[in-house]
Amino acid sequence: MGAMPVLLFVLGVGSSAASSFGEVAAHRPVVSHHLGTFNGKHVQYTATVEGIDVPDAKGNPAARVVSFSYTDDNPHDSASRPVMFVFNGGPITASLWLHLGIMGPKRVSIPDDLSADPSTYKLVDNVYSPLDVADLVFIDPASTGFSRVLPGTSPESYFSVSADAQQVTAFISTWLMQHGRLSSPAYLLGESYGTIRAAEVAAQLAELPHPILLKGVALMGEAINIVEYRQRQQNIVSYAVSLPTLAALAWYHNKVVRKDKTLEQFVQEAWRFAQTEYLTALFKGNSIDAAERDRIAQRLEEYSGIPAAYYREHDLRITKERYRGELLKDRGLLLGRNDGRYVAPMTDKGLAEDPSSVITVGFKRFFTDYLRKDLDVDWPDEYVVLKEVGLEEWKWGGSGPFADWPYGDRLLKVMKANPRFRVLIGNGYEDTQTTVGAAAYAVRQAGWPEGRARLSFYEGGHMAYTVERSAKMFTDDVRTLIGASWPAQLAR
């Protein structure tokens, strides 16, 4: 899955090197009390940083998972107050991004001016956090954050979809039991690879001897139909579902005639073309006649900003990766991978660091201070943002030429077990990793009962919530997922 690289850096907390697990296990929970205003509601809440020992699939102690929880001090009824468990992807990265990006009581505020120096980023009160409607628990899988495997357990034992999810499943069931919350409505939020984890965890919770049936799952930057993101030459669906993202980027960078259409309107027009005329032309392959090929190539230019001549020479295809270097090639600029709104000069070799990686600078800078000043965490341990795991090292669940990766089927299983279970899918228009077209395609092909899934698109990239208006839209959607009303909106 080369099109979905991870963020490769580690954030050090304290001056010492990474501690042994024994030192981590010695820490007692750190509890602090706070007051915040979220969605206009004043909330007194308790922040708790604590570790929970979890077993492996055989029941043997395997890891200590450290979480950050925020719980309302004065709920109307603690047993019925919703709780949402939050994690990122990686495959193994800490929950830092969702924690400080959108869901926690503080958030990194990134200016609308994309050229702004990261030194101008600020850590602000997060008025968008859904703490007004749910308690939040941020999970760092073993080998990330302060979480570690126990002696006798190798980190590699968790390098699979199933084992990784089993660890999180064990943590959630234990947390709910220890905190007396087994009757609380429970939800998951996963981002990027975390959406695959969320699907598997939801199913594993339902398969426990004493099942835990979640009320819902939110998938941000969904990747459950991961095969549609890998643009092999013969995977024609992947090119069709990627066109809406190319159209969004061409519209944003003013490389197409907008025809007075908004971003949403332009993308929808490109999507209609992609799933009809474009997909049909791709299916014809080398049997397509010259006149139709030329007509489709011209339409592709109108939507993507890439000259028709390029499409004629490349079988009516351009990969997302190639597109990043082609759209603004005349200006010597490369588009961001995580967020294609960001640009940076290409090197002599035509390569450059992902221009949108500048977003992460603020997170690294603020998290250390937040831990110490707000949460009173002053442990000497290293807070590991990401465990560097090659995608080829990860066991995705299928092997051999006839394997399948039906992650969406795991959510279908939960829907059948719980008629009230629902799914929110959110994606950023300018995200070239997990694209809006593929998300819409996933919902259409999932076989989920009608009205159980809601699909929302936001301005921005892989972390669309770094855009102020998208932050509000996304958290409003999360509140809708948790609330009583559910206006399902399936893919058009």
Residue ranges and their predicted role:
Residues 19, 59-157, 444:
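N-terminal cap/lid subdomain of alpha/beta-hydrolase-fold enzymes
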Residues 131, 141, 158-176:
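Alpha/beta-hydrolase active-site loop
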Residues 181-193:
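Alpha/beta-hydrolase fold nucleophile elbow
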Residues 421, 435-445:
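Short alpha-helix in the alpha/beta-hydrolase fold that links the catalytic acid
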Residues 447-463:
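Catalytic histidine neighborhood in serine/cysteine hydrolases
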Residues 461-471:
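Catalytic histidine-centered segment of alpha/beta-hydrolase-like enzymes
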